[in-house]
Amino acid sequence: MVDVNRFKSMQITLASPTKVRSWSYGEVKKPETINYRTLKPEREGLFDEVIFGPTKDWECACGKYKRIRYKGIVCDRCGVEVTRAKVRRERMGHIELKAPVSHIWYFKGIPSRMGLTLDMSPRALEEVIYFAAYVVIDPKETPLEPKSLLTEREYREKLQEYGHGSFVAKMGAEAIQDLLKQVDLEAEIAELKEELKTATGQKRFKAVRRLDVLDAFYKSGNKPEWMVLNILPVLPPDLRPMVQLDGGRFAASDLNDLYRRVINRNNRLARLLELGAPGIIVQNEKRMLQEAVDALIDNGRRGRPITGPGSRPLKSLSHMLKGKQGRFRQNLLGKRVDFSGRSVIAVGPTLKMYQCGVPRLMAIELFKPFVMREIVAREYAGNVKAAKRMVERGDERIWDILEDVIKEHPVLLNRAPTLHRLGIQAFEPVLIDGKALRLHPLVCEAYNADFDGDQMAIHVPLSEEAQAEARLLLLAAEHILNPKDGKPVVTPSQDMVLGNYYLTMEDEGREGEGMIFKDIDEAVMAYHNGYVHLHSRVGIAVDSMPDKPWKENQLHKILVTTVGKILFNSIIPSEIPYLQETTNENLTDSTPDKYFLEPGQDIQTVIDSLEINAPFKKKHLGNIIAEIFKRLRTTETSAFLDRLKDLGYYYSTLAGLTVGIADIPVIDNKQEIIDAAHHRVEEINKAFRRGLMTEDDRYVAVTTTWREAKDALEKRLIETQDPKNPIVMMMDSGARGNISNFSQLAGMRGLMAAPNGRIMELPILSNFREGLSVLEMFFSTHGARKGMTDTALKTADSGYLTRRLVDVAQDVIIREDDCGTDRGLVIRAITDGKEVTETLEERLFGRYTKKSVKHPETGEVIVGPDTLITEDMAAAIVNAGVEEVTIRSVFTCKTRHGVCRHCYGINLATGDAVEVGEAVGTIAAQSIGEPGTQLTMRTFHTGGVASNTDITQGLPRIQEIFEARNPKGEAVITEVKGTVIEIEEDAATRTKKVFVQGKTGMGEYVVPFTARMKVEVGDEVHRGEALTEGSIQPKRLLEVRDTLSVETYLLAEVQKVYRSQGVEIGDKHVEVMVRQMLRKVRVMDPGDTDLLPGTLMDISDFTDANKDIVISGGVPATSRPVLLGITKASLETNSFLSAASFQETTRVLTDAAIRGKKDHLIGLKENVIIGKIIPAGTGMARYRNIEPLAVNEVEVIENIAVDEAIVESSED
């Protein structure tokens, strides 16, 4: 058996007839499949056991030889070799075709490879192949042109004219094969290269395309005539099975029908040739054979597809590979796995962060082999069969064994759709009753799970290695941070937030206010016995909490706080200051001094002088988690999270918050506000009727009036709300709902959008407490429906975007420590107009500097060169007033097929520097794709007359950027660096002209009349700067500026879209994706290299090709950078396996076969396809080639190290 993990590379070429014969175990001569009576395969048929091997293991067809001991013997009666039945999946047969047949992939693909090789048009080829015309193969002495076409009539006339045998002309694939055999590749290539030196325009384009194909044949060693088949391979029978159904009927693969047609026509052709039938009949039969083979290879590519019962097109060999149901995506990239189950999930509030509840019945089934092994080991049963019976009977003793087996054996839980890597995490199983899986409430956010009927799948890692990885890398307690932005992803929500909010509230004049306690226990006892309320402000001796980081001047004093806050602080690690207020200073520095009592001071006076502090909201809890993680890392954080969860649930239960209709307040002056708005609208309409304003102005004024009315009601609501109102508490704490929900309950619902997206002028005046009228209800349904459809469409769009992103970046892996590049990227804050979309501080954190950063005033070095910037350093840089910093960036990294550690920086998911082997491309793709569903689908109209273009935003804009399409609402850019000297308006053509004066000359740009200008007369502009509002076309920018400018522009654009929707994504993820779009260059002039002009190639391959030429003193090739959209970039990847499994499978494989492409299995996808361990993480060569050391060797190495250290110190 071939060991997949030893594979170096995989090559695909055209198969020569000898190759096909060498694969084959015999010729299939009859169209029969199996005998209808005996159900045994027919001899020489499509399922023949002589050719393809036995149907039963170690048993010949007639039954003379049975058992493994006859292995390898060929039966003398039936001729079947005694071997495993599995060989029926690998042994091929063949069909000897009685006439050559063209391969439809090479004749029909775009561009037609046959056509380019012969320099004939695809239409001419079609006429010849399908017997509609003759082609002149050898004109001999006649004046006929070689390769010219003759109709049947012309052919006969020419024969009469020049005499029989005076020239050779044929029809059918046979003629094409003869022509292909005549092609002299070397001579043709030399001729084309000469032609290229002078050719221009269309002629040059065609020559380049022909040269490309001929060169591919020449370099790969494929012969052009192999594009025509004389012998057809037959797929192994178990890959096109025939199975008996219950009713005695048979279900067979479509391929069998297609093969049957080929065999029937081939046999008929053989008979006709034997009988010497008239030419026209033979011709017709040959054409039918050609069509049968076409249908077998790619049914439906030419003409109407061959259909089966119910006029359903039959699935041909090509269809077996294509699409989501094809071989690649269905069976190779995603397989169904054993040792897995799925069930509904329920909440497990008592679980620890690293645990999940698994139903007993499920666990016994999943861990069956482990339990059976243990039963035999404990001698409850003599052998495995007996042990299996024990488990299936449900013997009492198996449950104790199960408990022992699952200890320390993590399982993986996955929820579909798995949008990012947090969609699969490992947990330790805890056995529970019932049939639902129990999930820890804090991991719900990562899975995007809720308990309204969601289901999850469970998988068991089997090998020791898999268990170790699950435990060390995938355990849920390790995944505190989100890989997309490095912020905690496990923040408490809903009840947990509410409980902690309630617990940390403060209130005036509640029972027990001003009491002083000696320690925590006394305070808690007083609370339990009803002497003091949770929210009462009381005093407690600082010295009773010795492990907190108090300042010197705070010791031996009394702290003013509440019992709730004492309880809340008791779960917080002792390294964090006592949290008395929600400020950042309190969290990072120390508890403010104003809460401490000097000896002899009256506590009541201090309490009265203090403001009432806001309770801890969801945002503050998130900050606390982040701070604890920063200081104490994973283990302590996950333990703290569990304590926070328990506390939250406990106190939200105790608080007993309920919502009734009386809790929705009534706004006293609602009617006045609405009447005023009505009055204003009436005035606007009057003004419109008098002709004082346009229809557009009136519409804008009316909608604005109603918006203002709604805002006024909302403002009034906020002013009058009672902080103890349960709805307000839920909203304020961030547990559920927001001000907009609240104002719909108590204010007014406001304006609604009509089905066409335009906002209707009639607002909904009622709120949900009062109830809506029938008409209002009807209006509001439009929006609801649109919301649902948008979400459904968006999910599909976003999923497809993620798939394309993953595909283009899947081979980007951290390959080395430092690439040693001499380039860096200058970064500053990203701004959109006046507002900052991403601050410099956010952009600096977790990157390596390229040059040292100096203080702009004092000149002192804040951060040295090639240093990892921490949060504190980033803050120091920004505080010093530095506006731009040169950092190491993915854009400028020199590593081939990946990135180096220094150019990438910190791994956002762990907060530490990234490790070699991290699959950063996939992480980047997931980080950009996962929030895709949160982006909007709409194209905004910029209101009325301001501009005539719509600005695309949300998901469509992201797709536009990554596919490098020409944007809607394109901005005009300048190609000259200089000053804007005049902007003249031309009313006649309805355009403006902008004149830019530069050092090298004057630039004149025509701008639409309605476009909004971004520049004024006298402004300085740089090359590639936008003169008008709108999006710059990146391909145009690439022509005017360099690659780095385009990369920086695309990065800023992507960030603008995501940030405007409140989604944060680390720069480095976008950098990884954008770099993949600019990996290729197009060769302009090959110089002395053997590159072809017009070829697309990887930058690193281009540099390599030039390196040798430059060293030997030749003329290097020149090239131009190319910007590819992600779909195009995925298809242009060097790995044909990866490209074929993405899209356009047949096109990719046709091209790869002609070029004889080798796939070096560098990316992740190609390794998954062939089943090899992926070259990322622990699958990287440097982690796999580790030799275990014997104990004594370790000692020797340690001694050597000690000796070396002694030597070094003595040299000093």
Swiss-Prot record:
GO molecular function, one term: DNA binding
Annotated Gene Ontology cellular component terms: DNA-directed RNA polymerase complex
Co-factor binding details: Binds 1 Mg(2+) ion per subunit. Binds 2 Zn(2+) ions per subunit.
GO BP terms in the entry: DNA-templated transcription
SUPFAM superfamilies on file: beta and beta-prime subunits of DNA dependent RNA-polymerase
Binding site for Zn(2+) 1: C60, C62, C75, C78
Annotated coiled-coil segments of the chain: none
Sites where the protein binds Mg(2+): D450, D452, D454
Keyword Transferase tagged: yes
InterPro entries named among the record's database cross-references: DNA-dir_RpoC_beta_prime, DNA-dir_RpoC_beta_prime_bact, RNA_pol_asu, RNA_pol_N, RNA_pol_Rpb1_1, RNA_pol_Rpb1_3, RNA_pol_Rpb1_3_sf, RNA_pol_Rpb1_4
Sorted UniProt keywords: DNA-directed RNA polymerase, Magnesium, Metal-binding, Nucleotidyltransferase, Transcription, Transferase, Zinc
Catalytic activity entry: RNA(n) + a ribonucleoside 5'-triphosphate = RNA(n+1) + diphosphate
Enzyme Commission identifier(s): 2.7.7.6
Cofactors: Mg(2+); Zn(2+)
Subunit note: The RNAP catalytic core consists of 2 alpha, 1 beta, 1 beta' and 1 omega subunit. When a sigma factor is associated with the core the holoenzyme is formed, which can initiate transcription.
Protein family membership: Belongs to the RNA polymerase beta' chain family.
Primary role: DNA-dependent RNA polymerase catalyzes the transcription of DNA into RNA using the four ribonucleoside triphosphates as substrates.
Protein name, entry field: DNA-directed RNA polymerase subunit beta'
Organism: Streptococcus thermophilus (strain ATCC BAA-491 / LMD-9)
Lineage per the UniProt record: Bacteria, Bacillati, Bacillota, Bacilli, Lactobacillales
Gene name of this polypeptide: rpoC
